[in-house]
Swiss-Prot record:
Species whose genome carries this gene: Ralstonia nicotianae (strain ATCC BAA-1114 / GMI1000) (Ralstonia solanacearum)
Subcellular location: Cell inner membrane
A Pfam family the protein falls into: Peptidase_M48
InterPro entries: HtpX_protease, Pept_M48_protease_HtpX, Peptidase_M48
GO aspect biological process, one term: proteolysis
Bilayer topology annotation: Multi-pass membrane protein
Name of the molecule in the record: Protease HtpX homolog
Enzyme class of the recorded protein, top EC level: hydrolase
């Protein structure tokens, strides 16, 4: 229950940020329009964001006929987790990665890149897909998709404020420097909110995935491999839609410094250490 309250507050913060930017562009009228737009975005995201994200990544749905081994693996893990069978997708990308999306367990989808299938053993791949199913089980998928959609909209609105300016309550033009500051700080604030939503949920999905697969060491090994391989392979679709990066099992974006500081994912080393502790002791560190 606490996680749901925290998530609601964080989503409210994203919506409030959206309204503030609307106010900078069009005063009180801009705030009202931004509020209506934010509510519309949340409604649209609830029903359609999974389809939108899968289309962004050109994900292709597979079946037991077209990808029998992979499909049956997901089917077996979903059964172990007590979940309905999700739709299964493959993305033709060299970078090893995977994500889950959908509004609830009854309307969920899991996707993996061809790159992850190429580098992981069957045991490691089971660990990764169990991690994604843990997101479904914990109902993280709606929150991550909603926050990704809203964060992307905030960035677009902030850029609009720079290029087209805005007006205050008296109709006077907003200082262009303020507009530039909004364009820089608003996406950063949205990223911080996404980070707060995502990091704790990744640890929980690691723990939950290890329980579903019964093999925390395999997931730890998979994370190590993905981390090493992903660092040297660009992911064009993720770079084009950076707000969706927090949905992935591993941050798909390249960059250092601030990019790492504000990463939506916990440090891979810490994730591995926690899983190895679980493998050795049977308990996941708090």
């Amino acid at each position: 229950m606490f996680n749901w309250i925290k998530t609601f507050m964080l989503m409210a913060a994203i919506t409030a940020l959206f309204i503030v930017i609307g106010g900078m562009i069009g005063g009180r009228s801009g705030m009202m329009l931004a509020l209506l737009f934010a509510l519309g975005m949340n409604f649209f995201s609830y029903w359609f964001s999974d389809k939108m994200v899968l289309r962004m990544y050109n994900a292709q749905e597979v079946s037991e006929t077209t990808a029998p081994q992979f499909y049956r693996m997901v089917q077996e893990l979903a059964g172990r987790a007590g979940l309905p069978m999700p739709r299964v997708y493959l993305i033709d990308e060299a970078q090893p990665n995977a994500f889950a999306t959908g509004r609830n367990p009854e309307h969920a989808a899991v996707a993996a890149t061809t790159g992850i299938l190429n580098i992981l053993s069957e045991r490691e791949l089971r660990g990764v897909m169990a991690h994604e199913l843990a997101h479904v089980q914990h109902r993280d998928i709606l929150i991550s998709t909603l926050s990704a959609t809203m964060a992307g909209a905030i960035s677009a609105l902030a850029n609009f404020a720079v290029f087209f300016g805005g007006r205050d309550e008296e109709g006077r033009p907003v200082n262009p420097i303020a507009g530039i500051a909004v364009a820089i700080l608003a996406p950063l604030a949205a990223s911080l909110i996404q980070m707060a939503i995502s990091r704790a949920r990744e640890f929980e999905a690691d723990r939950g995935g290890a329980v579903i697969s019964g093999d925390p060491q395999a997931l730890a090994s998979a994370l190590d491999k993905i981390h090493r391989f992903a660092a040297g392979i660009p992911f064009a679709a993720a770079e084009a839609h950076p707000a969706t990066a927090q949905m992935m099992i591993m941050n798909p974006l390249h960059g250092g410094g601030l990019a790492n500081l504000f990463s939506t994912h916990p440090a891979t080393e810490e994730r591995i250490a926690r899983l190895m502790h679980m493998a050795q002791t049977g308990t996941y560190p708090a």
